[in-house]
């Protein structure tokens, strides 16, 4: 770090400590805010030693980030914004706390992806899903897709682990030469009836394809659901947690037996394992680590009440 950034790191750490000591919060944002004010280049310098994964999307960011972190921890310490502080200042604070870590699992708000990625230079992006959310803050869904598209296209060497069941995510990732397609589930599809690059989406079971929205409309080169490289089989929504076999490239087959509830979390787990494998983690170790996650910043936790 430069002298200015070392001062910024010390000041940010002090601000975080003061926030916690005074009961004003976890300090997950204020530490990064202070550091960034002192040294605008602080994040790029701080992130340089890390091999990072950026996780983004409308739903499932915190859960998937927690799963990615668990998988990466099978190979050593990991820096991560575990409390969901997912804007630039929260990412800074997470990396400041990553003592001994060379990898980072970072949840990033959709609208902050291009700016954070420009400084972090991630090895892997995880694009989960897109739907209308917080319209007063982020605007229409098309503008969010454009942000994610810009984030991916600015990093052609990065791997994009993208949900091929969501047409908006497919559009955001399609220009990158290193996409890993995961069949993670479509969820709500009403916001992807119109495709950002032209055409309308027609769904048939798990598949989807584009048709012209008007006579003579040209369709984009990628005009149908990409063939997934990772997919789930033998899905069982058991009372103790969802289970499935995750298939991947080169004959990979690993078992997911999640502690977290719901079909959606199987999709999150599939993308987390795919991201970890892209970072060099053994598939079986990644699946076991992801399956061991029991709570996410207090969510899904179980308490005995007398």
Pin down the residues of each PLM region.
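Short, basic phosphate-binding NTP loop
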Residues: 1-56, 74-75, 84-93
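Proline-aspartate-enriched helix->loop->beta-strand connector
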Residues: 101, 122-123, 157
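Extended acidic/charged loop-beta regions that coordinate divalent cations
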Residues: 106-133, 171-255, 297
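Glycine/threonine-rich flexible loop motifs
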Residues: 135-143
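A short helix->loop->beta-strand "cap" motif at the edges of active sites that frequently abuts
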Residues: 155-159, 176-178
């Amino acid at each position: 770090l430069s002298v200015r950034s070392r001062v910024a790191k010390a000041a940010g750490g002090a601000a975080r400590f003061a926030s916690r000591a005074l009961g004003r919060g976890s300090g997950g944002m204020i530490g990064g805010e202070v550091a960034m004010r002192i040294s605008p280049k602080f994040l790029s310098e701080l992130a340089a030693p890390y091999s990072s994964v950026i996780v983004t999307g409308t739903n499932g960011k915190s859960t998937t980030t927690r799963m990615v972190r668990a998988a990466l921890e099978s190979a050593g310490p990991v820096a991560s914004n575990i409390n969901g502080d997912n804007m630039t200042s929260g990412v800074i604070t997470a990396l400041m706390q990553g003592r001994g870590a060379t990898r980072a699992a970072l949840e990033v708000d959709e609208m902050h992806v291009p700016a954070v990625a420009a400084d972090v230079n991630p090895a892997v992006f995880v694009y989960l899903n897109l739907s209308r959310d917080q319209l007063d803050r982020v605007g229409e869904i098309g503008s969010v897709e454009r942000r994610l598209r810009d984030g991916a296209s600015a990093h052609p060497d990065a791997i994009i682990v993208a949900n091929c069941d969501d047409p908006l995510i497919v559009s955001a990732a399609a220009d990158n030469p290193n996409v890993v397609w995961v069949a993670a589930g479509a969820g709500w599809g009403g916001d992807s009836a119109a495709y950002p690059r032209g055409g309308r989406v027609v769904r048939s079971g798990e598949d989807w394809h584009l048709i012209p929205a008007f006579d003579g409309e040209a369709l984009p080169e990628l005009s149908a659901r990409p063939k997934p490289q990772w997919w789930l089989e033998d899905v069982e929504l058991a009372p103790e947690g969802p289970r499935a076999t995750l298939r991947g490239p080169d004959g990979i087959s690993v078992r997911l037996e999640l502690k977290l509830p719901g079909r959606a979390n199987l999709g999150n787990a599939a993308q987390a394992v795919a991201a970890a494998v892209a970072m060099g983690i053994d598939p079986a170790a990644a699946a076991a680590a992801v399956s061991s996650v029991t709570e996410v910043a207090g969510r899904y936790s179980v308490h005995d009440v007398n």
